Design a protein with these regions (language model features):
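Helix-loop junctions on the cytosolic side of multi-pass membrane transporters
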Residues: 135, 139, 181-211, 289, ...
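An amphipathic, aromatic/His-enriched active-site/gating alpha helix that lines ligand/cofactor pockets
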Residues: 405-408, 459-468, 486-522
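C-terminal transmembrane bundle of multi-pass solute transporters/carriers
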Residues: 59, 69, 73, 80, ...
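Substrate-agnostic recognition of the 12-TM MFS/MFS-like secondary transporter fold
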Residues: 20-40, 62-78, 82-97, 114-173, ...
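Juxtamembrane intracellular "pre-TM" segments in multi-pass secondary transporters
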Residues: 2-21, 200-234
Length: 532
């Protein structure tokens, strides 16, 4: 049953009523326009600096490759440091790189290799801040506006791509690529100014920040033990791995299937963008009838049918109309999957979780095109498109086992109900490992319910930092259970007290109800001695 059947549709523009989000959204829009202008200008300039196809192709690699290596570390830094200051530093660095590219180009000092290297720096800067931009959205909009806010972000991305490409072409024709690079540098000024005036309220904590490598491991551990985040990742992979065939083969669709030229390619690209923009505006209306799981499934089927029509009917108007539906489906899945990832993550690990989600997303877009291009080369272009569409249909059915609609109901707000332990020993912050045991006396009729709830609690312990968790039954006293878990240091255990959510607190309440009357959980802490 659809959980959204009686929900009143939100206005897609409602998050813009929130002043902080409005200014951040406009600033990101302007910055993205500048980034798309740089991509167009740099690509054109490289063709005038070298005749090497490899160097020209490496421009795209320089923009996207850093994400594979930097997303997770940058997510860890974003969760450790102040996100506002981190974003400011990243944008200032990219602004400086853009100024250098512009000045070198205008002065005639730019070379193919220097352009490639400086573009790589911009790519690194973008990868450094990508998870942070996504992770601050829930900080500036209420949960009820999160879907619309993510939709506006995807809308802004597509609008900036169209505007940036058009402006770049006009400016290159009038003044050359150097002027485009200067415009890109200027686009950072607005976003830096907005960040400088944003009065962000950092999360309240009495503990020092995590160490970098520990933060990375914690992010990976959280993902491993978070079915909600895994569901968002699997649904995303199930769509984008196969749907990437559209972007991979779009130039060949224009040239070979439709027997067109650059203008045909431009029209096809515009059709995809129009569909994407339209669906972003209509998505709140769609959500009144379908939940996120249903939206992704329907969008995948629409994409498969529309792209199959493009592969079989080689008529320009038909192809543009079909690709318009493909663009709409693409954005529906992107917005729904991103919302599922956002709602699966508490604030303390949000940037790391978003970074891991984006790594799988970008990995699908990187690996998929290689496969579809190879199939097209071995067989034919329509065959590759139809194989991908068939795979997409099967994947949309197979991945339905991972439900994401329930993520909307998760409450990651810190419960603050768990009192800090009061040890009689002196325990250093980095002393460990630490073993925690909790004894439960369970009534026999409630045993099955207890084991189900304790397993859920164990997943929460591991998401919050436990490196080991297990439940044991006393062989000499049936019904007496010992929960044991290990954390690396005493400080990590104190962080667990800060991180435990209202969702996990409800699980603990349900467990208490299942215990024998007159008993309560008995907690003990054991720490590795400083000297052996």
């Amino acid at each position: 049953m659809s959980q959204t059947a009686t929900v009143k549709p939100q206005s897609p523009w409602s998050p813009l009523k929130i002043t902080t989000f409005r200014y951040l959204w406009l600033a990101v829009l302007v910055s993205n326009i500048g980034s798309w202008m740089h991509e167009a200008g740099a690509g054109w300039l490289m063709t005038t600096l070298t005749t090497s196809p490899v160097l020209v192709a490496l421009m795209q690699t320089a923009t996207s490759l850093p994400a594979f290596f930097i997303l997770l570390p940058s997510g860890a830094l974003s969760d450790i440091l102040d996100r506002r200051k981190y974003l400011m530093a990243g944008n200032i660095g990219m602004c400086i790189a853009a100024v250098i590219i512009g000045v070198m180009t205008l002065s005639g000092l730019i070379t193919a290799w220097s352009l490639l290297g400086l573009t790589l720096l911009l790519g690194i800067g973008m990868a450094m801040i990508m998870p942070t931009w996504q992770s601050i959205i829930p900080e500036v909009v209420p949960r009820t506006e999160l879907q619309a806010a993510i939709g506006l972000n995807t809308l802004g991305m597509n609008v900036s791509r169209v505007i940036g490409s058009l402006l770049a072409g006009t400016i290159i024709a009038a003044s050359g690529s150097g002027a485009v690079f200067i415009c890109n540098a200027l686009s950072f000024i607005f976003i830096i100014s907005v960040l400088a005036t944003w009065k962000r309220v950092p999360p309240v904590t009495q503990l020092p920040p995590e160490r970098f490598f520990d933060a990375v491991k914690t992010g990976l551990r959280f993902t491993w033990h978070s079915p909600a985040l895994q569901a968002a990742i699997f649904r995303s992979i199930g769509f984008y791995f196969f749907a990437s065939v559209m972007w991979a083969l779009l130039p060949l669709i224009a040239k070979d299937l439709l027997q067109g030229g650059p203008l045909t390619y431009t029209f096809l690209f515009a059709a995809i963008s129009i569909g994407a923009i339209g669906s972003a505006l209509l998505l709140p209306k769609f959500r009144t009838y379908l939940n996120n799981d249903q939206l992704i499934t329907v969008a995948a089927l629409v994409f498969a049918v529309a792209l199959s029509i493009t592969a079989l009917v080689h008529i320009n108007v038909v192809a543009m109309l079909a690709l318009c539906f493909c663009g709409a489906a693409w954005i529906i899945v992107m917005t729904s999957a991103q919302l599922a990832a956002q709602t699966a993550l508490p604030n303390w690990v949000r940037a790391r979780g978003i970074a891991i989600f984006q790594m799988f997303f970008m990995g699908s877009l990187a690996i998929g095109p290689v496969i579809w291009g190879s199939i097209a080369e071995i067989t034919s272009l329509p065959t590759a498109m139809l194989v991908a569409c068939g795979g997409l249909v099967m994947a949309s059915i197979f991945t339905q086992r991972w439900k994401i609609s329930g993520n909307d109901n998760l409450d990651h707000t810190p419960s603050q109900h768990w009192l800090l332990p009061q040890p009689k020993l002196f325990i250093g912050a980095q002393q460990g490992p630490v073993l925690i045991t909790v004894r439960y006396e369970v009534a026999k009729p409630d045993l099955e319910d207890f084991l189900r709830e304790i397993k859920l609690l164990g997943s929460g312990r591991q998401r919050d930092g436990a490196t080991f968790w297990q439940i044991f039954e006393d062989a000499t006293n049936p019904g007496s259970y010992m929960e044991t878990y290990v954390v690396a240091t005493w400080l990590d255990h104190l962080r667990q007290h800060e991180r435990i959510s209202k969702q996990d607190a409800l699980i603990q309440q349900r467990i208490r109800v299942l215990l024998q009357p007159g008993t309560v959980p008995l907690v003990s802490h054991f720490v590795h001695p400083l000297v052996l």
